[in-house]
């Protein structure tokens, strides 16, 4: 009987061990499945995150940079870096483009849009969006992969001078759009970049895109009251419409080749050469 008792105890112990092994296997399989799902997803930046950016103009939480009175689209958060993609417009080696820019600046002085943009003139081919630090390397690799076989394109500025208003209606820009005959080249490039951005759930470029070279800008005020700040010029909100043509007889410049695409992540500039 004692022998049978030991036998039954051993058998129970084996059953218990088998049950534990099965449970462990189930847990391992479940964990493996969950890990695979996590790898397949890009977390941290849901679409609702960017929907909030679109609504930012309705809140008093807009961030004012007191250095230059610019309104940021989103608040600075440690670990987030403002990012955008663009190509540069040659000005140092192109007198015709420099003369065109000076002509637009004179128009800006006439209509009070006269705050100079940065000295490095460029055309953006993405929105500005925040990227998390741990996504930077993956995003950079994917963007390079997307543009790896992209050929250089020819671009020509148009004869029109237009105004563009930013998303949160805080600034107005005096700009030169792309000549319509060359527009399809850049739109195809934007489509490729959008395909990369969508993988990370970053916002795509604007609907009905109108890529442009911004020359000067002004802050927008919601009323007609003059500001006490003599160093900053303001434009009433309803004075101009977005994409309104101010002048359509600018001197036509020659085309130029875009053979390098840049992107800024925070203060770091990177680029890739096109074929």
Swiss-Prot record:
Protein name per UniProt: U6 snRNA phosphodiesterase 1
Pfam families membership: HVSL
Catalytic reaction(s) noted: a 3'-end uridylyl-uridine-RNA = a 3'-end 2',3'-cyclophospho-uridine-RNA + uridine
GO annotation, biological process: U6 snRNA 3'-end processing
Keywords: Hydrolase, Lyase, Nuclease, Nucleus
Enzyme nomenclature, EC number: 4.6.1.-
Originating organism: Dictyostelium discoideum (Social amoeba)
Family the UniProt entry places it in: Belongs to the 2H phosphoesterase superfamily. USB1 family.
GO cellular component labels: nucleus
Keyword Lipid biosynthesis: no
Binding residues for AMP: 122-124, 206, 208-214
Role: 3'-5' RNA exonuclease that trims the 3' end of oligo(U) tracts of the pre-U6 small nuclear RNA (snRNA) molecule, leading to the formation of a mature U6 snRNA 3' end-terminated with a 2',3'-cyclic phosphate. Participates in the U6 snRNA 3' end processing that prevents U6 snRNA degradation.
């Amino acid at each position: 009987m004692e022998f049978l008792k030991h036998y039954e105890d051993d058998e129970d112990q084996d059953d218990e061990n088998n049950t534990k092994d099965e449970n462990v296997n189930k847990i391992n399989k479940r964990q493996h499945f969950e890990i695979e799902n996590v790898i397949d997803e890009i977390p941290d930046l849901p679409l609702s995150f960017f929907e909030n950016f679109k609504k930012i103009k309705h809140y008093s939480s807009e961030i004012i940079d007191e250095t230059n009175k610019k309104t940021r689209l989103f608040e600075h958060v440690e670990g987030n870096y403002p990012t955008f993609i663009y190509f540069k417009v040659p000005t140092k080696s192109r007198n015709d483009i420099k003369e065109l820019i000076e002509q637009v600046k004179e128009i800006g002085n006439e209509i009070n849009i006269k705050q100079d943009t940065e000295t490095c003139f460029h055309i953006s081919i993405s929105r500005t969006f925040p990227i998390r630090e741990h996504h930077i390397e993956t995003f950079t690799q994917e963007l390079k992969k997307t543009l790896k076989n992209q050929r250089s394109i020819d671009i020509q500025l148009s004869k029109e001078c237009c105004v563009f208003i930013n998303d949160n209606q805080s600034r107005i820009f005096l700009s030169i759009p792309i000549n319509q005959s060359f527009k399809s080249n850049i739109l195809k490039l934007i489509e490729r970049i959008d395909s990369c951005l969508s993988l990370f759930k970053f916002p795509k470029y604007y609907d009905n895109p109108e890529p442009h070279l911004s020359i000067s800008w002004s802050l927008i005020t919601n009323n007609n009251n003059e500001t006490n700040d003599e160093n900053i010029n303001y434009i009433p909100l309803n004075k101009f419409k977005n994409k309104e043509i101010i002048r359509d007889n600018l001197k036509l410049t020659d085309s130029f080749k875009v053979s390098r695409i840049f992107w800024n992540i925070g203060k770091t500039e990177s680029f890739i050469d096109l074929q």
